[in-house]
């Protein structure tokens, strides 16, 4: 689930029900260039995750106030706060399996960057577009987006065609043409809209 306030400028909260982060690894997760996704050099050729360089968490903690709560399976929960890039102490905390990261006051300490933010409305539109892209790319995952207390998206795990209909428009239901092509070592699967769904803007290509 993704919760934002004022287009993410005041609050961004990301919560998942994944494997969680053990308490003794929480500080490592926020150190630059630290990653749990690569164990050997060979892993570089089979990466299928959204990130692996260990930069995202370290970058966000340098420009915001961050709190993380996480619990792995059959383990107690742990919590840690990071302010201005400084890691706090890891503390026991009530938590279910998974991780929740809360980001407050984005760019509060870098006014030069903050001035480039658009209005909360415009930044919110960017958040919605990003969530839509992730939701379409991972239809087997549930996604929920809440903005300023309002439910914007609430998607359950489903097949790709149903996900397209729920994210884009119910009118897409009978207007999609399936693609399923395989050649040698690559394949292409997805859907095209028929002529009734032609748009003048190229933005609806996912």
Question: What is the role of each PLM region?
Answer:
Residues 1-206:
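N-terminal phosphate-binding caps/lids of nucleotide- and nucleic-acid-binding domains
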């Amino acid at each position: 689930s993704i919760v934002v306030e004022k287009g993410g400028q005041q609050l961004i909260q990301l919560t998942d029900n994944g494997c969680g982060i053990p308490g003794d690894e929480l500080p490592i997760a926020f150190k630059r260039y630290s990653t749990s996704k690569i164990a050997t050099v060979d892993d570089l050729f089979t990466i299928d995750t959204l990130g692996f360089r260990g930069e995202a968490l370290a970058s966000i903690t340098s420009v915001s106030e961050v709190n993380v709560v996480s619990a792995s399976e059959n383990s107690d929960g742990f919590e840690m706060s990071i302010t201005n890039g400084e890691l706090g102490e890891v503390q026991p905390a009530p938590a279910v399996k998974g991780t929740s990261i809360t980001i407050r006051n984005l760019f509060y300490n870098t006014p030069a960057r903050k001035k480039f933010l658009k209005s909360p409305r415009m930044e919110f539109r960017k958040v919605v577009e990003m969530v839509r892209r992730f939701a379409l790319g991972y239809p087997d995952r549930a996604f929920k987006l809440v903005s300023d207390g309002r439910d914007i998206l609430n998607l359950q795990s489903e097949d790709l065609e149903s996900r397209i209909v729920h994210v884009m428009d119910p009118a897409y239901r009978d207007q999609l043409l399936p693609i399923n092509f395989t050649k040698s070592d690559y394949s292409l699967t997805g859907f095209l809209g028929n002529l009734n769904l032609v748009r003048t803007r190229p933005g609806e290509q996912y």
